[in-house]
Amino acid sequence: MGSLPIRQRATIAGNIVNASPIGDMTMVFLALDAEIGLVEGDSQRSLPLRDFFLGYKQLDLRPQELVEWVRFEKPGEGALFNFEKVSKRTHLDIASVNTAMALNISNGRIHTACLSAGGVAPIPRQLPQTAEYLIGRRPDAETARGAAETARSEVTPISDVRGSADYKRLLLGQLVLAHFNVLFGIEAGIFEEETA
């Protein structure tokens, strides 16, 4: 993530406050259901990271506030995590679409789930409908395909220089399938691009 010069100077807070709808670290923290702490002089407050993004490049951040911390619960036994992105270049490129998925598996079923997606809305966002779909299911090909379809229907991307809205929806579906492939070795097929 990032070139060597950027990794030497950049901060996690800067990445989040940049408010990019496709920031890689933001996707990671959203999938981990992180909380953000803000400080202004002696005044402190915290809120879920998912509530920090109000609109395109708009944050719940007052003019003199600084990000003091970002935290999330330490994943326990049975926790799995994966991050995926599609970009034109393999390294050092801004994503067209990116996504992260955090799961907790118990007794062969998905006990908790949290997914995030970027490039598919004006803000980086969680995918609560997809997470709800996953809870209680076995991690198999049918579940992977259902999660991918749910994610695709849950987003409202716009067409821009990085791709059409339909293409971004397609990419998100493919990346959700990739999560299952990486975490469980599941080959769930691919989606075909929709044509009008």
Region locations from a protein language model:
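C-terminal structural segment of proteins
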Residues: M1-A196
